[in-house]
Design a protein with these regions (language model features):
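An alpha-beta-alpha
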Residues: 144-207, 226, 318
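Beta-alpha junction/loop-to-helix N-cap segments that form part of ligand/metal-binding clefts
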Residues: 21-25, 47-54, 62, 66-138, ...
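Short, low-complexity disordered leader/linker segments with a strong preference
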Residues: 1-34, 65, 379-380
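Extracellular/periplasmic periplasmic-binding protein-like sensory domains
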Residues: 240-312, 326, 366-379
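Extracellular/periplasmic bilobed ligand-binding domains
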Residues: 185-277
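Segments of small-molecule ligand-sensing domains
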Residues: 298-308, 319-372
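Extracytoplasmic "Venus flytrap"
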Residues: 32-57, 79-86, 108-109, 173-182, ...
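Hydrophobic alpha-helical segments within soluble ligand-binding/sensing domains
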Residues: 88, 147-170, 182-184, 211-213, ...
Length: 380
């Protein structure tokens, strides 16, 4: 390669993969609005990313079928971060610099949203996470939003539920590699102990582990009445199965990270009688939820989960904000997203607070006959 060509190539590479300043020229064309999405379509938590993407794609297809937004069709460009650390930063830089997106949707996992959020914030590209519940995500800056509840609320919901069952002695098993799990355990412990409960054992593991017998044996000894397993479905199913093998027959509790068909596929009957908090229930008979389920089934020939519903809501809230802003100019679009109030989504009525977090209810689900069954709704 000749020297001028080499220099040009290096300059281009630096532009795409380094500072990632947003191009000054307007994104898209006169007939389209370009939105980026990053999701874990492959890898360890692919179930989350695939579901979220399906919901997002369904919303975009519906919007385009009805004429688009501001008279323009929406073009969705999706990048797979492969459930890997490091990939979110790479793909988000590409979406901003190469594709010149006007807004960004993603991720489900808090650790991956935390990796991407500083890049979106620096470029002043509004980012909406459908399901990252760790509080630190929106603390990155004023261009970062979420439409799900946060872990301080979710941890409180689980602790209140445990105490409503009369359980005063609990154990905690945390995935130390996931910000989500660490935060959820912390907030559960704070509320549970502040209101008279005792944490009799705290154990940890790392994402990808397969053998949890040592931790479970340590948990069994002080006789807890329930165990919080605050990580993702990828390990929770194995933990449930191994707990039952060790004769631990008390209820396990989890957060929205349990929401995947793979949970029951891995654990089988060992998951029966356990509980987790989530964003919606397919057993809710409200028309908006049943209509969403009907459309999702027709499009994908499967039941939606909460990640699919949150993906749908995130795209619809973004479209609503673009309409209210009357433009895709980043500052005005940011302000319109921040002003979201009483938006009736599939996962509830959504209002964004001053910290750009959604105030909305949670549901408690239990596992019975291999299905997620509704128990109760808990308001903020």
């Amino acid at each position: 390669m000749k020297l001028p060509s080499l220099i040009a190539a290096l300059v281009l590479a630096a532009f795409v993969f380094a500072g990632c300043k947003r191009p000054e020229a307007p994104a898209g064309s006169a007939t389209e609005i370009i939105i980026g999405e990053f999701a874990s379509l492959t890898g360890g938590t692919a179930s989350f990313g695939q579901s979220s993407h399906k919901g997002t794609k369904m919303a975009i297809d519906e919007l385009n079928a009805s004429g688009g937004v501001l008279g323009k069709k929406i073009k969705l460009i999706t990048e797979d971060d492969q459930s890997k650390a490091g990939e979110p930063a790479t793909v988000v830089r590409k979406l901003i610099s190469r594709d010149r997106i006007v807004a960004l949707l993603g991720e489900v996992a808090s650790s991956r949203s935390l990796e991407a959020a500083p890049i979106a914030q620096e470029a002043r590209v509004p980012m909406i996470s459908p399901a990252s519940t760790n509080p630190k995500v929106t603390e990155v800056g004023d261009y970062i939003f979420r439409i799900c509840f946060i872990d301080p609320f979710q941890g409180t919901v689980l602790a209140k539920f445990a105490q409503s069952k009369g359980w005063t002695r609990a154990a905690i098993l945390t995935d130390v590699k996931q910000d989500y799990s660490v935060g959820l355990s912390q907030f559960f412990k704070e509320f549970f102990t502040r209101h008279g409960g005792t944490i009799v054992s705290e154990q940890s593991y790392s994402s990808g582990d397969k053998d949890f017998k040592a931790q479970l044996t340590s948990i069994k000894a002080p006789n807890p009445q329930a165990i919080l397993v605050s990580g993702y479905y990828t390990e929770a199913g194995l933990i449930a199965r191994q707990a039952r093998q060790l004769g631990i027959n008390i209820p396990l509790l989890g957060g929205d990270g349990w929401d995947s068909p793979s949970l029951v596929e891995v654990a089988g009957e060992a998951m029966a009688g356990n509980f987790f908090s989530n964003h919606f229930s397919t057993e809710d008979q409200s028309p908006i939820i049943q209509d969403f389920i009907k459309k999702y089934r027709a499009k994908y020939n499967e039941e939606p989960d909460a990640m699919g519903a949150l993906g749908y809501d995130s795209a619809m809230i973004l479209a609503d904000a673009i309409k209210r802003a009357g433009t895709t100019e980043s500052g005005k679009l940011r302000d319109a997203i921040a002003a979201t109030k009483d938006y009736q989504g599939v996962t509830g009525r959504i209002t964004l607070d001053e910290k750009r977090n959604a105030s909305k209810p949670a549901v408690i689900l239990t596992i019975k006959d291999g299905r997620f069954r509704y128990v109760e709704t808990v308001a903020p």
